[in-house]
Amino acid sequence: MGFDYFYGQQSQQFAFYRIPRVLFTDNRFRKISTDGKVLYGLLLDRVFLSQENGWVDEEGRVYIIFTLAAIRKAMDCSEKSAIKYLTELEEFGLIERIRQGLGKPSLIYVKNFIDQENLRVMKL
C-alpha cells in the first residue's frame, strides 16, 4: 500500500481526537492503559458534542451518552474490553457513570483532570 505525503495545508483537512498529553507524561496517570487513555480522548470528544447539544444537568455539568456498542465499534474491541476500559477510567476518577435503568444507557460524566483552583493536574 503506497501512501502519499502531506503537502501544504493538506494536513489540516482531517478531524482528530484529542488525548491530553499529560495522560502520557505525568507519572500519576501511568497506571491507566493506553486503550483507557484513548477511550478518555473519545469521551472528551463527545463532551464537546454534548455541550453543543445542551446535554447539561441541573447542576450545569455536561454529560454524555456513549453506549457499550458505540464504544466497541469506535475502539474495535469486545464488550469485555469496553467494560474494562470504562471501569478503569471510573476507578481512577476520570469518569462517573450514572445508571438510568429501564434499559436506558448510562449517563457518563467525563471529569476534568485539571484542578481549576490551582491550575495544575489534580492528585488522584
Features from the language model and the residues they span:
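Charged low-complexity intrinsically disordered patches
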Residues: 2, 114-124
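Low-complexity, intrinsically disordered short peptide segments enriched in small/polar/basic residues
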Residues: 16, 35, 92, 107, ...
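Compositionally biased, low-complexity repeat tracts
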Residues: 4, 32, 97-99, 123
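Short recognition helix of helix-turn-helix/winged-helix DNA-binding domains
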Residues: 1-69, 73
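Winged helix-turn-helix DNA-binding recognition segment
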Residues: 46-110
